[in-house]
């Protein structure tokens, strides 16, 4: 069974895991888990229907990390840095996590406490992309219907919260 309606996890001949997309073209570029931005090789661009949808130059992940980190360093406000990183995550999760791993000590206070409290308070002003599944007392009577809208087929982890910090954004 595929892990998602949009991709599955496969292994190559060396046993290395990779994502095999079931979508191509414009839709592929809109899925943060699959979008590699300018890191798609020329062959991948042809096979995945990305010709003409990306700038022609292929950049490595290292080049992408250097570019976004330079931009990140120009931002002064912790909240603006948080927003910048979340927007990156909404576009390209591979690049986001690679960058954060390289700069974890510097970025963790931006992505989590103390900055996340301010981000939650400003949530309605900075919300851009839905992440995960939300159930509340307002939709509990339609929970089965709502679960059908989740694009994942093989869910192995669920994080539940009492909304203690999140109540500020409600």
Task: List the model feature ranges, each with a label.
Residues 2-163, 167:
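Metallocofactor- and cofactor-centric catalytic cores in central/energy metabolism, strongly enriched
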């Amino acid at each position: 069974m595929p892990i998602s309606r949009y991709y599955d996890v496969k292994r190559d001949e060396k046993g290395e895991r990779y994502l095999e997309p079931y979508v191509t073209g414009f839709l592929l570029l809109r899925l943060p888990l699959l979008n590699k931005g300018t890191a798609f090789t020329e062959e991948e661009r042809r096979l995945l229907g990305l010709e003409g949808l990306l700038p022609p130059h292929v950049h490595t992940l290292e080049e992408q990390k250097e570019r976004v980190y330079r931009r990140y360093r120009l931002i002064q406000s912790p909240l603006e840095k948080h927003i910048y990183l979340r927007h990156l995550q909404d576009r390209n999760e591979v690049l986001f996590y690679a960058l954060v791993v390289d700069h974890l000590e510097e970025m963790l206070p931006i992505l989590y406490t103390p900055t996340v409290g301010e981000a939650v308070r400003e949530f309605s002003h900075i919300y851009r992309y839905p992440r995960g599944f939300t159930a509340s007392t307002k939709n509990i009577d339609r929970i089965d219907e709502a679960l059908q809208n989740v694009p994942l087929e093989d869910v192995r982890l669920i994080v539940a919260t009492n909304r203690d910090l999140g109540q500020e954004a409600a």
